[in-house]
Amino acid sequence: MGDVNLLAVVLGTLAWFVIGAIWYGPLFGKPWREMNGITDEMVKAGPRPGQNPTWLIMLLAFLFEMLVVLMLGHNIARTNPAPHVIMMMAVGFGAVIMTPALGINYLFQMRPGKLFFIDAAHFIVGLAAVGGVFIALG
């Protein structure tokens, strides 16, 4: 068993976070906001009193992503897998753990299927990038 590659954890989290900025910005930002009832005026106005400030939302999102990446890094350190297995583990986290958990919540909240696919695909693509970082940093 080796040590967790903390550089890969930080850079992998950063890669996932940047993908999220692109994903929920130019790629799918407009339909995502519409399905969540967020108007352009609301975005421009910023958080209302009683809502979390934007900096806190971003920080917590980054830390939650880092927690997932740290767990993946721990699994990689414990098993010392081949590169293709690292990618299978990373994509598996997104497709088989995070996506079903998200799906359960979306079903009970009666959220649109299109919104589910946008969010679930973000997890899968983001974690594939994380897997790539772990492979690159060996």
List each model region and its residues:
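Juxtamembrane/disordered regions of integral membrane proteins
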Residues: 1-138
